[in-house]
Design a protein with these regions (language model features):
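The feature captures the beta-strand-to-loop junction immediately N-terminal to the Walker
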Residues: 45-47
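Helix-to-loop junction immediately C-terminal to a conserved catalytic motif
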Residues: 60
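Conserved ABC ATPase signature
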Residues: 124-128, 132
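Hydrophobic anchor residue at the start of the ABC signature
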Residues: 138
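A short, proline-enriched helix->beta-strand linker immediately N-terminal to the Walker B motif
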Residues: 143-147
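Conserved beta-strand-loop-alpha-helix hinge in the C-terminal portion
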Residues: 204-227
Length: 238
């Protein structure tokens, strides 16, 4: 993996050039280019096995790549589908993991307050609902003030109402902190609700791009994206 650091405030959140990744003889990502700007929210759709999570893991520095280049200011923050909280640590201690500098508890308290859990600093993960645990995971990511936030289907295991609440919270937090965001998801409606730009990945490459606009018809956008994913719908019956 080739990783080149930009000076802060002088570059996009991440720039990928000619990225390739293979498992054995199977090429999972093929000469992929991608730029995500500061404050831009990008959603990545695609069938299982198309390379979405492999791309996210490469951007996070969790997987090596065989070719290409990733330019980023510093290590990004990641929120996974599972919250990955340590059950033997309190909430604020979970948020503090890997956090450098002074005033750690105060900064963690502020982050937990942002996600609506400021009164539960010394509580334990076992006492949280699924949505609350994911809010702690978001606080843990954003307390780092990352230039790039990677979201790997973080709402997939939540019920419908909790997902809607989490969408609103994420939009609010991203607007406040202004990281570049890459959301990997299978949910077309989630992508439409959250993203400034929606990408469809197919066979290890970006096959389609949609840039959100105020004039967009959500139903038509949904139908177009489903078509790109190989799901044909009749707009009149949706």
């Amino acid at each position: 993996m080739t990783l080149h650091a930009y000076p802060l405030n002088a570059a996009p959140a991440v720039a990928v050039t000619g990225l390739s990744r293979a498992y054995g003889r199977r090429l999972v990502i093929k000469d992929l280019d991608l730029v995500i700007g500061r404050g831009e929210f990008v959603a990545l759709l695609g069938e299982s096995g198309c390379g979405k999570t492999t791309l996210l893991r490469a951007l996070a520095g969790l997987d090596a790549i065989q070719g290409g280049r990733i330019d980023a200011p510093r290590r990004p923050a990641v929120v996974f589908q599972e919250h990955r909280l340590l059950p033997w640590e309190t909430l604020w201690r979970n948020v503090s993991l890997g956090l450098p500098g002074a005033n750690i508890r105060e900064r963690c308290a502020a982050a937990l307050t942002e996600v609506g859990l400021g009164n539960r600093l010394d509580d334990w993960p076992r006492n949280l609902s699924g949505g609350q645990a994911q809010r702690v995971a978001l606080a843990r990511a954003l307390v780092q003030e990352p230039e790039l936030l990677l979201l790997d289907e973080p709402f997939a295991s939540l019920d419908a109402l909790t997902r809607i609440r989490m969408h609103a919270l994420v939009k609010q937090l991203v607007a406040r902190h202004r990281p570049g965001v890459l959301l990997v998801t299978h949910d077309v409606d989630e992508a439409i609700a959250l993203a400034d730009r929606i990408l469809v990945m197919r066979d290890g490459a970006i096959a389609f791009e949609h840039r959100a606009a105020r004039s967009d018809d959500p139903a038509a956008t949904r139908q177009g994206l489903l078509g790109e994913l190989g799901v044909e719908t009749d707009l009149e019956t949706v």
